[in-house]
Amino acid sequence: MRAERRKQLFRLLGDLPDRRPISVETLRIEEREENIVETLLLDLNGHEKAPAYFVKPKKTEGPCPAVLFQHSHGGQYDRGKSELIEGADYLKTPSFSDELTSLGYGVLAIDHWGFGDRRGKAESEIFKEMLLTGKVMWGMMIYDSLSALDYMQSRSDVQPDRIGTIGMSMGGLMAWWTAALDDRIKVCVDLCSQVDHHVLIKTQNLDRHGFYYYVPSLAKHFSASEIQSLIAPRPHLSLVGVHDRLTPAEGVDKIEKELTAVYAGQGAADCYRVVRSASGHFETAVIRHEAVRFLQKWL
């Protein structure tokens, strides 16, 4: 049943490329005070190369656990992967690159379609072109994330069985979708991204989210909690702001109720948590603290 539901979800994501070996070009290696930053160019999909950063601790003994960092949207198309290193005005400091490497994790971030060094076409144009040619923008973004996992596992300095994912907003959505579709993700942490698409329709909030996220026929076959149930029983933490209009409370409550039952049914009640912060669509000190603590516990 689980495998079939996962196949069904993949089928909704449009015509995806065949899985392929990942080629990488190292453009630069920069040694910073606390970590080492590799600037990379990854051929993840055979259509368009993805610029990436891999950041690792300076002092490690052997391969390290690693985190796939998913950047947010925020209408900041020039940012992309640089969010990992530079942060954003809605994220706390230190940057996730400094935070995570200080804890001993390696971190990979890629530019998703239309962001960072892959910008040039508008998001709406990419969405429409892909729709016309049998592809789904969200599906191609997910494909790149799954290929990024292939690359992470190929690195000799990464422990291939200790990979987690984290992201904020669009990045949080990508984190839980990637975890739902691939068991190689051992821990999932999402920030400000518990969006129930059925509740968005009900509350007339569809226009609060970009074109990138809309998958044809998704609402006919899956709810948000049904997708995320594919993560269970692996550890999953969702961090939400109670005043976040992009994640209506009705949807968050529904997802939490249903996933709590799923995890309990699999004997993993302690592996799923929802933490609410008295805030809007941004990271708070509470959110950062809980995210870091969860990663340290499970990864």
UniProtKB/Swiss-Prot annotation:
* Record Pfam families: DLH (PF01738)
One of the protein's GO biological processes = proteolysis
Report the EC code(s) recorded for this entry: 3.-.-.-
Looking up SUPFAM superfamilies in the UniProt record yields:
alpha/beta-Hydrolases
Molecular function in Gene Ontology:
serine-type endopeptidase activity
**Keywords carried by this UniProt record:** Hydrolase
Check the record and name the InterPro entries matching this protein.
AB_hydrolase_fold (IPR029058), Dienelactn_hydro (IPR002925), Pept_S9_AS (IPR002471)
Q: Which family, according to UniProt? A: Belongs to the dienelactone hydrolase family.
The protein's name is Putative hydrolase YtaP
State the species of origin. Bacillus subtilis (strain 168)
